[in-house]
């Protein structure tokens, strides 16, 4: 198959639409179920590159959750502790495969943003992973293969309309890539820089110690940034992105956005949130929305009389700003990657509030000294990678 007609492009009025190969090769995919659209394929192909690189860099199964050509989450298949199983709503599923753990992490980090996601998996989709996907609102999945049991589960989703794409894991694109804007063709070499330990070797702070687990997490952050619209900043902890700040014109706004998402991830683990008693039969999305509001500044939207009764069995106490700050002060060992240099130390100040201890960024700002000095103030270890990772 050298081309595939699509229903429409980005919007319903943008017709005709198709994906195709410029050379004489066949498309490296097979659509096993559903009818993926233009944006689905953009998510799928960006996501597939991300998880393929995560697997190569870490040796672990990887998953990502994409929305509008940007990763809401990305993770490798480390085991889940009981708290994470609870906040990812998988505590009733028994032991999960490494690939299923990777998707539980990728989906669970920012569940609000992952609603209706497109999933990419580095490995053959197994029954555990398919069973997890079955429970979530999602548009589709791309993987190098599917077990018979997994495919049966996924084909039954959305009344048979769930998009399932098999990709040839041996496919490699041409070294030059092209895109058109306003009828004008742009050409560039593909971004094929390997993200490895060597990239993290130039540690410019007084603290030179970056443990192996932090190196793994920094590589996850940088690989995630390779496929995130710029400007972008990514917070990672324990093998998963916990906050992705994407597509902001201001670097510090990226850091604030990603930091707030990371804070929300950690706040969801607080006993005060874990102990919330929801009404029977509440939908997963409504539960996610209620938690997001409860831990935020608009908490009275779910605690006001006439509102809380629809969500909770027992009216929760207010989660005060002081209580939240005290809980967040316990967050440690977080890593941070940035797709370009930090122009001001305000980014470091904000990162510190979310438990960041390890940073990777290109360096090259005229204010590098001020940024390094701020890192030293908090005993952070920061590596200058010397490479920018813009994605447009």
Predicted regions and their residues:
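Active-site loops and adjacent core secondary-structure elements that bind or stabilize anionic groups
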Residues: 1-199, 214-232
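Conserved helix-loop functional segments at active or binding sites
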Residues: 53, 227, 264-268, 353, ...
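Flexible, glycine/charged-enriched surface loops at secondary-structure junctions
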Residues: 57-65, 164-167, 230-237, 267-278, ...
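Active-site-proximal loop/turn and secondary-structure-junction residues that shape catalytic pockets
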Residues: 70, 125, 237-240, 248, ...
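Glycine- and Gly-Pro-enriched alpha-helical subdomains that act as flexible
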Residues: 72-112, 242-341
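C-terminal binding/interaction regions
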Residues: 117, 121-122, 135-165, 170-172, ...
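Bateman/CBS regulatory modules and CBS-like beta-alpha motifs in cytosolic regions of diverse proteins
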Residues: 124, 203-213, 342
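Substrate-contacting helices/loops that form the catalytic groove of nucleic-acid
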Residues: 175-210, 268-288
């Amino acid at each position: 198959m050298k081309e595939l007609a699509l229903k429409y492009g980005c919007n319903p009025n943008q017709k005709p639409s198709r994906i195709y190969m410029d050379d004489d090769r066949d498309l490296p995919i097979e659509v096993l179920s559903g009818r993926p659209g233009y944006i689905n394929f953009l998510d799928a192909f960006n996501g597939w590159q991300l998880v393929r690189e995560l697997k190569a860099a870490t040796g672990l199964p990887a998953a990502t959750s994409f929305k509008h050509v940007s990763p809401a989450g990305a993770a490798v298949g480390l085991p889940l502790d009981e708290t994470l199983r609870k906040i990812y709503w998988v505590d009733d599923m028994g032991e999960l495969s490494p690939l299923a753990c990777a998707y539980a992490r990728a989906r669970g980090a920012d569940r609000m943003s992952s609603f209706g996601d497109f999933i990419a998996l580095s490995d053959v989709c197994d029954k555990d992973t398919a069973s997890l996907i079955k429970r979530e609102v999602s548009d589709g999945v791309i993987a190098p293969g599917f077990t018979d049991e997994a495919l049966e589960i996924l084909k039954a989703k959305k009344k048979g309309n769930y998009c399932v794409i098999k990709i040839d894991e041996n496919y490699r694109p041409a070294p030059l890539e092209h895109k058109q804007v306003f009828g004008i063709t742009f050409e560039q070499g593909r971004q094929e820089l390997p993200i490895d330990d060597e990239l993290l070797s130039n540690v410019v702070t007084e603290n030179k110690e970056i443990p192996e687990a932090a190196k793994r997490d920094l590589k996850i952050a940088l690989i995630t940034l390779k496929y995130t619209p710029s400007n972008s900043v990514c917070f990672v902890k324990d093998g998963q992105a916990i906050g992705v700040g994407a597509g902001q014109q201001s670097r510090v706004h990226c850091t604030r956005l990603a930091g707030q998402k990371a804070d929300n991830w950690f706040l969801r683990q607080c006993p005060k949130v874990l102990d919330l008693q929801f009404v029977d039969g509440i939908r997963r999305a409504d539960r996610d929305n209620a938690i997001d509001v409860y831990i935020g500044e608009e908490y009275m939207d779910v605690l006001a009389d006439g509102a809380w009764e629809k969500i909770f069995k027992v009216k929760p106490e207010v989660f005060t700003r002081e209580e939240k700050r005290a809980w967040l002060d316990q967050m440690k060992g977080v890593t941070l990657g940035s797709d370009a240099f930090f122009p001001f130390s305000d980014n470091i100040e904000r990162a510190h509030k979310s438990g960041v201890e390890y940073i990777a960024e290109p360096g090259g700002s005229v204010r590098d000294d001020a940024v390094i000095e701020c890192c030293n103030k908090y005993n952070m270890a920061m590596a200058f990678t010397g490479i920018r990772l813009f994605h447009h």
